[in-house]
Amino acid sequence: MNWHFLRTATVLLIFLVVVEINSEFRIQVRDYNTKNGTIKWHSIRRQKREWIKFAAACREGEDNSKRNPIAKIHSDCAANQQVTYRISGVGIDQPPYGIFIINQKTGEINITSIVDREITPFFIIYCRALNSLGQDLERPLELRVRVLDINDNPPVFSMSTFVGQIEENSNANTLVMRLNATGADEPNNLNSKIAFKIIRQEPSDSPMFIINRNTGEIRTMNNFLDREQYSQYSLAVRGSDRDGGADGMSAECECNIKILDVNDNIPYMEPSSHMVRIEENALSQNLVEIRVIDLDEEFSANWMAVIFFISGNEGGWFDIEMNERTNVGILKVIKPLDYEAVQNLQLSLGVRNKADFHHSIMSQYKVTATAISVTVLNVIEGSVFRPGSKTYVVRSDMGQNYKVGDFVATDLDTGLASTTVRYVMGNNPANLLNVDSKTGVITLRNKVTMEQYEMLNGKYQGTILSIDDALQRTCTGTINIDLQGSGWEKDSEKVTSSQNSGSSTGDSSGGTGGGGRENPSEGDTTTNTGGKTSTDYEDGETQTQSNNNHQELGSNNLSDNVHFGPAGIGLLIMGFLVLGLVPFLLMCCDCGGAPGAGAGFEPVPECSDGAIHSWAVEGPQPLPTDATTVCVPPIPSNNANVIECIDTSGVYTNEYGGREMQDLGGGERTTGFELTEGVKTSGVPEICQEYSGTLRRNSMRECREGGLNMNFMESYFCQKAYAYADEDEGRPSNDCLLIYDIEGVGSPAGSVGCCSFIGEDLDDSFLDTLGPKFKKLADISLGKEVEPDPSWPPESTEPICPQQGTEPIIGGHPPISPHFGTTTVISENTYPSGPGVQHPMPIPDPLGYGNVTVTESYTTSGTLKPTVHVHDNRHASNVVVTERVVGPISGTDLHGMLEMPDLRDGSNVIVTERVIAPSSSLPTSLTMPDPRESSNVVVTERVIRPASGMMGNLSIHPELSNAQNVIVTERVVSGSGISGISGLVGSAMGVSGGGMAMNSLGGGGGLSSSMGGTATIGHVRSSSDHHFSQTLGSASPSTARSRITKYSTVQYTK
């Protein structure tokens, strides 16, 4: 295929199309003028129909409205129809909005606001021409509006401080760093062209750097950088746009240039020469110190020096150790010098650095020698063994006193055998050898036996000492013996005798060599081992004794045979016998015997907290029971000096501990409690006799010895059943022994179930009378959200009781401040005696958070000679029952008043239950003053009073400071004399009752009562959403009508 022709044809075709599109058709028409007969030629031009394009550029940061209209569009379709012009794009219907607007009739486009080129460098406006139906008459037209740039942005450096480094002595024009700065103005424009300039240099001695104004490169100006002169330079550089013009904007930055160190300084030593002296055969660790000076950077490899020997140390006597922190060299003597061999030495030392020298001074470096003159001093030398060790061979056929060889010391001064020394054995394993003290001849002490051969493992290594008594010097030589051959003697008796003989001989020899001198003197001693090594010591006798000790230790160390002797076998047999004796010991052991037999386990003390049950029956712990309804036998009245403590109930519960004694008239009152719950039953009454005026109550320790009487228990529970059956069947819960709290928190087992006696087992009509105590259970069953109760941790304190004999305070607060906690002691059963009126005693309540069961029995009467422990009857026609209250009683009226002071704990509650007092002198009302905190709760329960002698209304003060306060009154039994009931005013709770007056609960925890009794502050919980507003009608004294359920705990929530 002819590609050249094809390319030519394609180019021609494209050219023809372009010409056709842009060409104009010119038609000439002859116009004949009939008048004058002339012809006119008219040129008619036909052009392609298109838009009229025009758009003027806008300058940023200026008001361009004076240039409006910046553009105008027009379509030739407007000649024969109505055209509507519309525009769209950025600045019109896209952010930023409203910059351009158009006249829809004329097509003029106007600008309305100031533009920023850095945000929008140009605008593209899409123009449309629409007819009356909204249809496009032309293709959309793109109109570009360019924004002209102005110099409104200064240069910006990428860093405020540039950091660079360069070695000293670098060549000129060496690149150090490159600065970077940019401008936000239009690129490739004069406004964004930045010129760099160094405006300051520190130190400013002479300029050392130059900068390229266009690229920002910083280079060295010369090769004179010297770190030892200046280690760092700081430059200030300015960058200006418009190529550094006067009308440009500028910015500045800092440049820190660090000069790196190179090894361009030759070290040298100070001083340049030394003279030292040293004795022969002496070693020195610090003969002379040589200091090296170097100007390079300290602690670098360019600064650390290395001192070397140039000459004079051919014998290797000296060595140099460098201290890298001080750059000081220490010359040491590591090999003894011999005066007879050399008297003077000339050492020549040189120095260099660890790092190589820089190329700039490599040619200048020359080794400079430092001379050290060493003078060797002559000393009187002792004898030495040359050579220091010898090896001999001993065979099995060599007998006692066999000459192994000789080992003679040499006098260093003369070079001949020493004649002034004596020889002794030093380390002599197995006492094998003996040495002649004068000649140094070594012989066998005894014939070598098999045991010695095995002990030495065929190799013997010992030492021989040469002692010069005149010079007080000692040298040491080493003796090596190779035991060869076989047939070593095995006679143990002979071996033992030989060893004993050799040992005594060695000891005597050692004593002769070391300490046999009569006049030992002090002096310098030289010890040479295998050469000319010398040491100093002062006492030659001590040295000899040390050698003897070494000999004995070496002999003991080699004796490492282990034998299993008779003692070890006996210990093993004894261990097995002991193991076999253990079963017999267990069979004979008395692991608990019959009671009273004298043998067995000791009882656990009652104060211990162990795993032993505190109840005296088998099975689980019995539930707490109430013994208040058990009939009490008549009390003898003719014996005033004997108190008969009759306890027919046998069932009691003690939950608190303590012991309290208090004077009652002329006698004593003793009350005992224990920190356990227990059940004691007895078929017969218990009688205890004490002195006059003294009451004694059996403790748990005494009751544990009793057994369980089922007949009595059956009688007791029958009485309880009949007592509850006589009561109103409309009670919400007929089981008073179960004290209910919030279900799931501290409730006893089975508290949800009802243990009451119900006539019909399948009758569930009792559910209609359930009280608010089951509200939480109902809420849980219905799926409602149950709010948790806040915790209330009380403080633990001790009770403070008033002194006996003080006058009762009426209307005031006595100085009694009981604190409440979980371990407070409670006096449960209190029995007044004596003729006088007893004063009130406050009893703080130790009840903690949770359910508790307390059974109490109190009684008061007229003037009683004996004080009797009596269980109170359930009902009495002439008593008011208050629980845990002790009140003074007189024969005619009640004058004793209880005044409870303000309690320090703001979350205390007040509980009044079961007050026992005669009706003849009961006051008309019970008054409780304002507690100090609105969270206090007052609960009054089971008030039984006669039909006469009391006011017939319950008045609750309306000034309750907090609507959350709760007052609950339960089981109020009143006679026909009650006139009316007034409820609670200003509170969310309704209360029904009679015969009691309470002031508002304002701020304290104190209680003031106008009747002769003591109110106990307890822990009571309820919730403010329970509204008790029942009205009790007339009832007989023996019945109780109430729809209010007893709550043992009432919780106040803010």
From Swiss-Prot:
Pfam families: CADH_Y-type_LIR, Cadherin. Three calcium ions are usually bound at the interface of each cadherin domain and rigidify the connections, imparting a strong curvature to the full-length ectodomain. GO terms for cellular component: cytoplasm; desmosome; nucleus; plasma membrane. Residues 496-507, 523-534 have a biased composition (Low complexity). Residues 50-157, 158-269, 270-389, 386-493 form the Cadherin domain. Desmoglein repeat repeats lie at residues 830-856, 857-886, 887-916, 917-944, 945-973. Residues 588-1054 are cytoplasmic. Glycans are attached at residues 36, 110, 180, 557. The chain crosses the membrane at residues 567-587. Residues 542-554, 1029-1040 have a biased composition (Polar residues). Keywords: Calcium, Cell adhesion, Cell junction, Cell membrane, Cleavage on pair of basic residues, Cytoplasm, Glycoprotein, Membrane, Metal-binding, Nucleus, Repeat, Signal, Transmembrane, Transmembrane helix. Residues 24-49 form a propeptide. InterPro entries: Cadherin-domain_protein, Cadherin-like_dom, Cadherin-like_sf, Cadherin_CS, Cadherin_Y-type_LIR, Catenin-bd_sf, Desmosomal_cadherin. This is Desmoglein-1. Residues 487-554, 1018-1040 are annotated as: Disordered. CDD domains: Cadherin_repeat (cd11304). Residues 508-517 have a biased composition (Gly residues). GO terms for molecular function: calcium ion binding; gamma-catenin binding. The gene is DSG1. Residues 1-23 form the signal peptide. It is a single-pass type I membrane protein. Component of intercellular desmosome junctions. Involved in the interaction of plaque proteins and intermediate filaments mediating cell-cell adhesion. Residues 50-566 are extracellular. It comes from the Eukaryota. One of its GO terms (biological process) is cell-cell adhesion. Its main location: membrane. Binds to JUP/plakoglobin. Interacts with PKP2. Interacts with DSC3; there is evidence to suggest that the interaction promotes cell-cell adhesion of keratinocytes. It comes from Canis lupus familiaris.
